[in-house]
A protein has these predicted regions:
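Beta-strand-centric surfaces of beta-sandwich/beta-rich domains
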Residues: 1-432, 499
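Extracytoplasmic
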Residues: 307, 312-316, 423-574
Length: 574
């Protein structure tokens, strides 16, 4: 469709044109300067644009098109008190504020490159904890503010340790900890170390985790680590502490509230969704972000079938009887769409972990409310619906809400139990034919491999059938041969292959019965990912299968004995 956008009066038409142009690239469209768009790319974050358009009197948007074709758009508005002066946007702003826009873009891309200002100091702490122990990591005196908090943990099983060691921070002798979350979950990318860069949080490949949310306090701050795991844990941390002028009645404490529900049974598309409580706070404050930490043990290997996020966010502010924020699906809240299985991160949103294939396994999503923080004067209630494409038992829904609250406010909090902090488990699974995978049958790659001294079989419940075929070719001349069976000749069909994407994965080529085959539309399939591991599905173009044995020959151009190919299973049409 098309949209028309008016600022302040019906005579002031700011834009008229394609809706997609306005929502996806307003800088290029409104400025007419494509080069400026390249210097402000961080304003566009997956399916969301964060380019601000201020107005002093009024805003009007009209959409024209076929109702049957429209999906939906989200438009976020921030309204100020009447005595607040606002300069309405004009195209002249691009010339006037060009340098500021470019600097802002640079800061969003590289949040640790901003110059330090004012009086600050670096405080360091280190603790070594036996199972069941707790220790004070830092004791800080105020009035001050933690402007950057970085932490690194070492343990034998780090994934479990980061879930079962708890970070608690008390500000100004509070009866309850304002920050109360598992060590890894606090940084928004659990379980384990899942590298990403955003404005308030970063996780580095070496395991360093960084928080840049400002944490002011008037008198003191105490940071404690509790070890509920069976691991010995070493935790090292640094806090950058700046002078802060605390103002009673204005200054707020930072809060991070974590909660977890295990062993849920998800509702299907045609059944009623259940609401997952994320936050219930009383007092004056601002919501600054949210993260979802999911375990989705569905056996369906496609997003259309294993997608967990059809539920909507509902955020009630103050005396709302109907939510001020009522979403259109969990992925839309997290700024992506169509149940994306990509690993990605932006300044305000990201998905640093998604095991796959599709959206199964462990998943972490986050959204930070920085330029769109959500203020409340009396109360805030944040609910997220859980609605799945299918019925799944053993589902886990963890979440953490980040917010600021004026001292004297209250938050409904629950104490952690050993069950909440249980170990990270990978349960055996097999691919199921349902919705997007309906009409397919699946064969484990281990059953199809022919003799090859560069092949091994790795056991782990991360993969279907509790194992994966691991091939490490010595050179680009090596090939891996898989035997694809067919009980009849099929003149035209497709085959699929589910591969593990890792930092050590090589690029792959394919030939079926001697003929080149393209997978995912590519002659050479790229299966590299910068960090971690994920399973992804790739499908061939049209191929012909003969009755009996069909040879799928896989090559790895440029192989050097270090790059790997990990093949989980093959898809064949029923």
């Amino acid at each position: 469709g098309t949209v028309r956008v008016f600022l302040d009066s019906p005579d002031n038409l700011l834009f008229q044109g394609k809706a997609e142009d306005f929502f996806r690239k307003p800088v290029e469209i409104l400025s007419g300067d494509s080069s400026l768009g390249k210097h402000t790319e961080s304003f566009y974050q997956y399916d969301a644009s964060y380019f601000p358009i201020p107005f002093s009197k009024g805003f009007r948007m009209e959409w024209t098109g076929k109702i049957s074709d429209i999906h939906f758009y989200h438009v976020g508005l921030r309204l100020y008190d009447n005595d607040q002066e606002v300069e309405s946007f004009t195209r002249e702003n691009f010339r006037k504020y060009k340098a500021t826009m470019i600097r802002t873009d640079s800061l969003l891309r590289n949040p640790d490159h901003r110059p330090a200002s004012g009086h600050y100091s670096s405080m360091n702490g280190e603790v070594r904890l036996e199972p069941g122990e707790q220790a004070v990591l830092m004791d800080l005196k105020g009035p001050s503010s933690i402007t950057r908090f970085s932490l690194r943990a070492d343990a034998g099983n780090l994934e479990n340790a980061l879930r079962q060691a708890v970070l608690r921070i008390w500000f100004d002798d509070s009866e309850t900890a304002q920050v109360n979350a598992p060590l890894g979950d606090f940084f928004g990318a659990a379980p384990g170390i899942n590298p990403y860069i955003s404005l308030p949080f970063t996780v580095l490949t070496d395991g360093t985790m960084i928080c840049r949310f400002e944490m002011p306090f008037s008198k003191n701050a105490r940071i404690i680590i509790e070890n509920h795991s069976a691991e010995k844990i070493k935790v090292s941390a640094e806090a950058i502490v700046a002078r802060f002028r605390w103002k009673d009645g204005e200054s707020m404490h930072f809060h991070a509230l974590w909660s977890m529900d295990h062993d849920l049974t998800t509702s299907e598309l045609d059944s009623r969704a259940s609401d997952i409580p994320c936050l219930a706070a009383e007092g004056k404050g601002r919501i600054a972000g949210a993260a979802a930490l999911i375990h989705n043990p569905s056996g369906v290997p496609t997003s259309w079938g294993n997608w967990w996020g059809e539920g909507d966010e509902k955020i009630f502010i103050d005396r709302d009887t109907f939510p001020s924020f009522f979403g259109t699906g969990s992925e839309d809240y997290f700024n992506y769409s169509w149940s994306s299985s990509r690993i990605f991160s932006y300044p305000y949103c990201g998905q640093p972990r998604n095991d796959g294939p599709g959206n199964r396994g462990y998943v972490s999503d986050f959204r930070w409310h920085i330029s769109d923080d959500i203020p409340f004067r009396e109360s805030a209630c944040f609910l997220m619906e859980l609605k799945h494409h299918g019925k799944v038992e053993g589902f886990s829904y963890g979440r953490i809400i980040y917010y600021y609250l004026l001292p004297g406010g209250n938050t409904v909090t629950g104490l952690f139990t050993a069950h909440d902090l249980r170990e990270i488990n990978y349960e055996p699974w097999m691919p199921e034919a349902f919705k997007g995978s309906d009409g397919w049958r699946f064969v484990q790659a281990e059953e199809l491999a022919r003799g090859n001294d560069r092949v091994s079989f790795e056991k782990d419940d991360f993969w279907a059938g509790s194992g994966v075929l691991n091939w490490i070719p010595a050179s680009g001349q090596d090939v891996l041969k898989l035997n694809i069976p067919s009980d009849k000749e099929i003149r035209e069909t497709r085959i699929g292959i589910t591969l593990t994407h890792t930092p050590d994965s090589g690029s792959l080529t394919f030939r079926l019965n001697g003929e080149p085959v393209r997978f995912s539309g590519r002659d050479t399939l790229l299966v590299f990912t910068a960090a971690g591991r994920l399973l992804d599905n790739h499908f061939s173009g049209p191929v012909r299968l003969k009755k009996g044995s069909n040879e799928l020959m896989i090559g790895m151009p440029g192989a050097d004995g270090r790059k790997t190919a990990q093949i989980d299973f093959i898809w064949l049409r029923k």
